[in-house]
From Swiss-Prot, chains A, B:
Example GO BP: diaminopimelate biosynthetic process
EC number: 2.7.2.4
Organism of derivation: Aquifex aeolicus (strain VF5)
Broad class of enzyme this protein falls into: transferase
Reaction it catalyzes: L-aspartate + ATP = 4-phospho-L-aspartate + ADP
Record GO terms (molecular function): aspartate kinase activity; ATP binding
Superkingdom field: Bacteria
Membrane spanning stretches: none
Keyword terms: Amino-acid biosynthesis, ATP-binding, Diaminopimelate biosynthesis, Kinase, Lysine biosynthesis, Nucleotide-binding, Repeat, Transferase
Keyword flag Transferase: yes
Name by which UniProt lists this protein: Aspartokinase
UniProt xrefs under PROSITE patterns: ACT (PS51671), ASPARTOKINASE (PS00324)
């Protein structure tokens, strides 16, 4: 029995007409010999309007009740989805999270899945029904309704696929994952296959496509994901284990992030505990720090730079200025006009010269690098915001559009 | 522990402002020393718009999916209700039908309650929470969502009250049950106490107030019901066991029904099986027959009259004409312009002369009686539709407004 979990996002089920389109895609999978298990989000806009309603009642609605309220959106969608399949002549049965059951911990509004019962799903499939499961919802061991956090339907789909040992199809409103944001780089290409790790590092590209937590989940259980457009028959992007990505190009994609602010604490005494003091204070204030760069020290002093999300910048500035004074740093410099450009690819692990090549491309285009940070499969450079698009286009042209040429060089380098 | 089940109908929870009003009524009960258990309907209009949506998808949506869809309305309402209580400082917890659980049979869209778990409710109450239960919903032993049919929230409330051995308060948009329709009889009075039997016979008055099935349920388990307006502090009408209705007046209320059509099958051969043939055919066509009147026969022939709902009249006419021809009746006469006037009261059981007095009042007002039918606590007369309002007013004036005088007569009659 070849089960296929097919997930449809909020835009895909946004109207009754669109639900019918989705249902037809399910029927197509059935005709190809798959046993489909549908996972549906709430119809586009429903969740937002429920949240708005709750906020009118209570500035901070109890999270338990919030979950009960929000679960309504998916319940409505699955009933309509199942009705549509029935109308088209295919017996279908909707299941809420508690009916599957999808058992979670009891952290309301951002619960984690603990286990999934599959016997009911399997017997429905054997009896010839198409199960239509509510995304986003779960139930605790104590019969409390929980939800999995924004975009949680992706996690539902991946978890079901893991439990059923099936592939997972994510039907959404974009055709797949691209090598760069097509609005910036018109030549951006759809990626055919990408590893979980690459997908995670390409978060800023991928987040528009699917919830990052669900990719982590897929990586953990080796669930193969096919992200594709609900509104087209084209193949999308497969997100798969690393060993399945045959073509290990050095650079899979290029991202740009202009939502960060850089701070530099100038002339910090270079002694143990200083970094800890700064970042502990930021952590206590629930500020997420992204890049952290510290150079070698000169004469017992160093400069320390880091970036935070722009929305946290004012709070961060206040905190850091206080600490800077306390530890005797010279000053704190704030720079809001920065962009973080990253290149990502598992090929990097075994390819020499990728970083140097990146710096060279930026230099040739007259772009100064303000900070560098690297991981195994990602290199990020902080640059002046006004060069962001230019940088992405230049990097895309040389790393991706001239890929064949690069791969030869890469091959040579590997010798 | 003095538990009080407080049910709020759709209009009562129709807006967030109204939900707050309802929540305040719950808090008032709490302050009076009650432990309230709230039952809420869906916000006014929700259920209808969900049905409309389903009809757009499927001309006859599968009933199982219909239940899953409709259950959404109450789930939304209870979450908002519980949030409101929390905002006002009173910890509350919403419970869907399956969370209570309210176990039903598996007849989707009109399920019957089989049993109710009360341990979760009791421990919530003991921990200081106000449980807010979704009306209208249940769950089968197989974890299928069911609904109890239109107005099913009343049944939920009465069943919970029965299980918890509590009184049941029905908060609605009318102040109680009246002796007649106040639009016809401006002097109609609110009834203070009425027996289950009277309430059932006054269906046409009572149906605007609460679901008839829930009254049957209350009668079976002796649940005392207090029907009152959500928007007023006044006492409403208590629906109670017969032995609690101290004041056994002959006539508790007067109803009029103009939604029926009368048929008379003229000169029917008076032999066994004829009546059965007519009414079996109507039953097979799912036509509900109300009054049936047959007089003594003359020379082997009799006339047989019955009434059906106007919406079924055309279908009934076709069926009856066929059978009339077959059994050799003379003709079938149809009369659409009839009204059924009924007087109801448990006092009738022990009071002589009530029927005669009713006929006399009608005669004095020049109203001809076309058919009569009686039960232990109800007398119905079919009259010309144009006299309907006149008849109700005249009967109300003499039986209800002049009640004291009547009771003296009644007392005399009983000697």
């Amino acid at each position: 029995m070849k089960i296929l979990v097919q997930k449809f996002g909020g835009t895909s089920v946004g109207t009754l007409e669109r639900i019918e389109l989705c249902a037809k895609r399910v029927i197509k999978a059935l005709e190809k010999g798959y046993k489909p298990v549908v996972v549906s989000s709430a119809m586009a806009g429903e969740t937002d309007s429920l949240i708005e309603l709750a906020k009118k009642v209570h500035p901070r609605p109890p999270e338990r009740e919030m979950d009960t309220l929000l679960a309504v959106g998916e319940q409505k969608a699955i009933a309509l989805f199942a009705m549509t399949l029935n109308k088209l002549g295919y017996p279908a049965v909707s299941l809420c999270g508690w009916q599957v059951p999808i058992i979670t911990d009891n952290v309301h509004t951002k619960a984690r899945i603990r286990k999934i019962g599959i016997s009911r799903l399997l017997s429905l499939i054997e009896e010839g029904y198409i199960p239509v499961v509510a995304g986003f919802q779960g139930v605790t061991e104590d019969w409390e309704i929980t939800t999995l956090g924004r975009g949680g339907s992706d996690t539902t789909a991946v978890a079901l696929a893991a439990a059923l040992k099936a592939d997972c199809e994510i039907n959404t409103d974009v055709p797949g994952v691209f090598t760069a944001d097509p609005r910036i780089v018109p030549n951006a290409k759809k990626i055919k296959k990408i590893s979980y790790e690459e997908m995670l590092e390409l978060a800023s590209l991928g987040a528009k496509v699917m919830q990052i937590r669900s990719v982590e989940f897929a990586a953990k259980y080796n669930v193969r994901i096919h992200v594709r457009s609900t509104f087209s028959e084209e193949e999308g992007t497969w997100i798969v284990p690393e060993d399945e990505v045959m073509e290990k190009v050095a650079v899979r994609g290029i991202t740009v992030d202009t939502k960060e602010t850089r701070f530099t604490v100038v002339r910090v005494p270079d002694k143990p505990g200083i970094a800890a003091e700064i970042f502990k204070a930021l952590g206590d204030a629930h500020i997420v720090v992204d890049m952290i760069v510290q150079n070698v020290s000169h004469e017992g002093y160093t400069d320390m730079s880091f970036t935070v999300n722009k929305t946290d910048a004012d709070k961060a500035e206040e905190i850091v200025k206080k600490i800077a004074q306390k530890i005797g740093a010279k000053e704190v410099v704030r720079d809001d006009k920065v962009a973080k450009i990253s290149i990502v690819g598992i090929g990097m692990k075994s390819a020499y010269g990728v970083a140097g090549r990146m710096f060279d491309i930026l230099a040739r285009n007259g772009i100064n690098i303000k900070a560098i940070s690297t991981s195994e499969i990602k290199i990020s450079c902080l640059i002046d915001e006004k060069y962001a698009e230019l940088a992405v286009r230049a990097l895309h042209e040389e790393f991706i559009e001239e890929m064949e040429e690069f791969e030869t060089i890469n091959g040579k380098n590997k010798e």
